[in-house]
Amino acid sequence: MSVKQSGQVFTPHYLVCNILDVANYSGKCILQKHIIDNSCGNGAFLCEIIHRYCKEFLTESTDKENLKKELQSYIHGIEIDEVAYRDCISNLNQIASTYGMENVDWDVRNDDTLKVRLFDEKMDYVIGNPPYVRVHNLNNQYSEVKKHRFAGSGMTDLYLVFFEI
């Protein structure tokens, strides 16, 4: 699938950090808050989120088993592309291992964000870099996109649906 069809462009680290800073994702206020990247790709945002979460948690506690539970409970992701999803899990595991944690059961799903409703209205932060795809390039996904308010009529981009979600 081409970039034009998938809208898949990975986010550079400096931009990830800037976006998280603008969203005020730092300090004690991030602990025990749900965050999702619903187009997580290879995990650029999730890796930085995990790094920030671990760093903040470890200023208060050395209980890595509890830290692991919190990472599994409060950090979420969705990625439709199976290769990017596997890369994401691998990248998250590398970050976790730098903090002395293994076998984290990440709440990252290889699924279509347009169809997942599990996380609706349950997040404290929604962050990421959604795909930029014109509706006429969506092929068979068009009927699902039309169900969303922003994409109800005329020409639009898929990224608007991700803002609505």
Each model region followed by its residue ranges:
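SAM-dependent methyltransferase catalytic region
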Residues: 1-165
